[in-house]
């Protein structure tokens, strides 16, 4: 076989949400990329809930899209219901969520990947990471079929497959997902290279035949009439009439009694399964045990697609014996005749505590080796995909001999995610919430393109169409802001509306922009009532109208200014780099705990050091004095992308290959 078949720029191991984004990013940025996964038919598989987004997670999905990722486009094509969560609260914490067709989503991801010319795929299992003789630099991978593939950068995205064990009642067996084999060999190989691993668990609920459910006794949960897309490139979504509904029901005291009969055979209670699981997604038996005073728990009955009757019983994750799950389901209102396609199960798997990775997601022990996704201790498709796109970006940056891209906490939820993992670590599956982001007012889901698309385009990942749309949106906002400032309304035009929303009426004509600052006023309703909507509104690409975006900024103005001050203060610390060989153990004037934690995390700068648990403000002050004494200079305020190192021949690195996929 020709040697070129075995040699690549980047190898991505695993074709889940993380691996798909990593492979797409690296290939779209110009790297010759090989994606190796156990079954090509399972690329982009939704192992658990057939949905993308939610509170915090939806922000991440839109950030991935803004950078030029594929998750948003696949979600919009596969979506069967679209909703904006948290609308009763402020816009900063609104979270888009889409129910997807499970098979349709995987098909859309596969189509996105197959549209990239320099991305190759292989069905095989990687069992060994290859390095140089010193074990310090990655050189490639060896597969189950005995083939060696070489690359200077390897991205590991093993998900739940690394030494995965599935539990259903007293039964347990190897697997990475029900019906699929676990992968073996990588953990032992990484141990030999000096890495430490741990075990985590997650779970999934039973699947049920929707034809056996009585929906008439359940509460209908339709999609939004003004559906919000995930991709900034999407123009059209299904009407609310064309969307499929989800349904709400509840467990009963009888359900709980039936479930308790299986506790003595539950791996969670017998000790057969002692790995930590997701705190915010407990199993139904865990909820009953921990919240014994509650006589019911809400369940969401979610369709798995337009091409199947199968439904997902969200809220009923379980590893109890199959017969107990079946009998308990039949005590739930509307599910008295339920036919169970398959039981829920728990799965435990290997992960590698994230103190072993840099902020670029490159590992500290092996040069050129990157970890992304559940291998770093996260849970959730969006969290995995976010790490995947950043690992793919930074693998190419390494090939370019350019600086790694590290998003700040003030720039993106992706930055919050990675900073939390590296600085704080995790001993349980980590998931994103808006509450984790201290600068969340700046990080709205509607402005992800304004925050990240220009960066994605400079890197050669986001297409020119994306950048043009972002600039068009910004122009629309500027023009509309000027129009709202120049346009006045009289009391006769708007007093009825102002009274109806409970705010004071006008004594004289006032600029529209002034009224938009009032908490009670909806900018679009105000303009419609005044007869100015068609005259003023310039639709901005990216889902929300320009007046709505301006209104949000106006109402948050004071908070935004305060958060920008906080960001500036933190960025001053982040400008102070800490040398790679800095010896914290030699410092007698910081606490022992700080020395130990900082030596383990190895932060890149003072800002990162200040967020390491156990490090005090006084420790940071001492570090700053020491850095100054050693002649360390603060870095420039603006990120240096080292664009000269990115290639400029139009055929190699630096040319976006993001492709629009037409689906018939």
Curated annotation (Swiss-Prot):
Residue positions binding NAD(+): 277-291
Domain of life: Bacteria
Family matches, as SUPFAM superfamilies: FAD/NAD(P)-binding domain (SSF51905)
SMART domains: GIDA_assoc_3
BP GO annotations: tRNA methylation; tRNA wobble uridine modification
Major localization class: cytoplasm
UniProt cofactor(s): FAD
Subcellular location: Cytoplasm
InterPro entries, A to Z: FAD/NAD-bd_sf, GIDA_C_N, MnmG, MnmG-rel, MnmG-rel_CS, MnmG_C, MnmG_C_subdom, MnmG_C_subdom_sf
Residues reported in the UniProt entry to bind FAD: 14-19, 126, 183, 374
GO MF annotation terms: flavin adenine dinucleotide binding
UniProt entry keywords in alphabetical sequence: Cytoplasm, FAD, Flavoprotein, NAD, tRNA processing
A single GO cellular-component term on record: cytosol
Biological role: NAD-binding protein involved in the addition of a carboxymethylaminomethyl (cmnm) group at the wobble position (U34) of certain tRNAs, forming tRNA-cmnm(5)s(2)U34.
Annotated NCBIfam families: mnmG_gidA
Family under the similarity heading: Belongs to the MnmG family.
Assembly and interaction partners: Homodimer. Heterotetramer of two MnmE and two MnmG subunits.
Name of this protein: tRNA uridine 5-carboxymethylaminomethyl modification enzyme MnmG
Source organism of this protein record: Salinibacter ruber (strain DSM 13855 / M31)
Gene it is expressed from: mnmG
């Amino acid at each position: 076989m020709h040697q070129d078949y075995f040699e690549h720029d980047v190898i991505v191991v695993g074709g889940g949400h993380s691996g798909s984004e990593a492979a797409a990013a690296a290939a779209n940025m110009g790297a010759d990329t090989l994606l190796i996964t156990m079954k090509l038919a399972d690329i982009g598989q939704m192992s658990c809930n057939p949905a993308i987004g939610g509170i915090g997670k939806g922000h991440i999905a839109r950030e991935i899209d803004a950078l030029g990722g594929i998750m948003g486009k696949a979600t919009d094509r596969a979506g069967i219901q679209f909703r904006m969560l948290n609308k009763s609260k402020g816009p900063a914490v609104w979270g888009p969520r889409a129910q997807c067709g499970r098979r349709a989503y995987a098909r859309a991801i596969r189509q996105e990947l197959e549209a990239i010319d320099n991305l190759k795929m292989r069905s095989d299992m990687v069992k060994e990471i290859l390095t140089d003789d010193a074990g310090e630099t990655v050189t490639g991978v060896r597969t189950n079929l005995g083939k060696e593939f070489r690359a200077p950068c390897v991205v590991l995205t093993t998900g739940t497959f690394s030494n995965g064990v599935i539990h259903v009642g007293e039964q347990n067996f190897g697997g990475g997902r029900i019906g699929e084999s676990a992968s073996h060999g990588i953990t032992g190989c990484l141990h030999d290279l000096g890495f430490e691993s741990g075990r985590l668990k997650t779970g999934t609920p039973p699947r049920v035949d929707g034809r056996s459910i009585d929906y008439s006794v359940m509460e209908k949960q339709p999609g939004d009439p003004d559906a919000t897309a995930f991709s900034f490139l999407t123009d059209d979504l299904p009407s609310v009439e064309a969307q499929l509904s989800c349904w709400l029901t509840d467990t009963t005291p009888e359900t709980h009694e039936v479930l308790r009969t299986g506790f003595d055979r539950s791996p969670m209670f017998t000790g057969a399964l002692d790995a930590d699981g997701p705190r915010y997604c407990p199993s139904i038996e865990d909820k009953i045990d921990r919240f014994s005073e509650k006589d019911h728990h809400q369940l969401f009955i979610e369709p798995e697609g337009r091409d199947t009757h199968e439904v997902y019983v969200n809220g009923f994750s379980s590893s109890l014996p199959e017969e107990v799950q079946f009998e308990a389901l039949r005590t739930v209102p509307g599910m008295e005749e339920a036919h169970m396609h398959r039981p829920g199960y728990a799965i435990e798997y290997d992960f590698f505590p994230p103190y072993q990775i840099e902020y670029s997601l490159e590992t500290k022990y092996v040069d050129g080796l990157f970890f992304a996704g559940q291998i770093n201790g996260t849970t959730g498709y969006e969290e995995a995909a976010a790490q995947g796109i950043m690992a793919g970006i930074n693998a190419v940056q390494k090939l370019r001999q350019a600086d790694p891209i590290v998003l700040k906490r003030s720039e993106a939820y992706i930055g919050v995610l990675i900073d939390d993992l590296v600085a704080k670590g995790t001993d349980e599956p980590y998931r994103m919430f808006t509450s984790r982001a201290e600068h969340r007012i700046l990080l709205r889901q509607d402005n992800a393109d304004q925050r990240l698309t220009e960066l994605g385009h400079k890197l050669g990942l986001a297409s020119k169409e994306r950048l043009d749309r972002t600039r068009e949106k910004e122009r629309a906002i500027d023009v509309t802001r000027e129009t709202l400032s120049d346009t006045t309304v009289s009391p006769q035009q708007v007093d009825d509306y102002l009274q109806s929303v409970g705010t004071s009426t006008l004594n004289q004509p006032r600029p529209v922009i002034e009224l938009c600052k009032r908490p009670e006023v909806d900018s679009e309703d105000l303009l419609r009532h005044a007869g100015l909507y068609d005259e003023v509104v310039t639709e901005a690409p990216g889902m929300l109208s320009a007046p709505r975006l301006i209104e949000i900024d106006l109402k948050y103005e004071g908070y935004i200014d305060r958060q920008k001050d906080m960001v500036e203060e933190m960025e001053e610390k982040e400008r102070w780099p800490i040398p790679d060989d800095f010896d914290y153990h030699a410092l007698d004037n910081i606490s022992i705990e700080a020395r130990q934690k900082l030596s383990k995390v190895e932060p890149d700068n003072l800002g990162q050091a200040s967020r390491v648990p156990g490090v005090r403000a006084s420790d940071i002050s001492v570090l700053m004095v020491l850095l100054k004494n050693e002649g360390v200079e603060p870095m420039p305020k603006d990120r240096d992308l080292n664009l000269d190192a990115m290639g400029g021949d139009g055929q190699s690195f630096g040319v976006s290959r993001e492709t629009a996929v037409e689906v018939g």
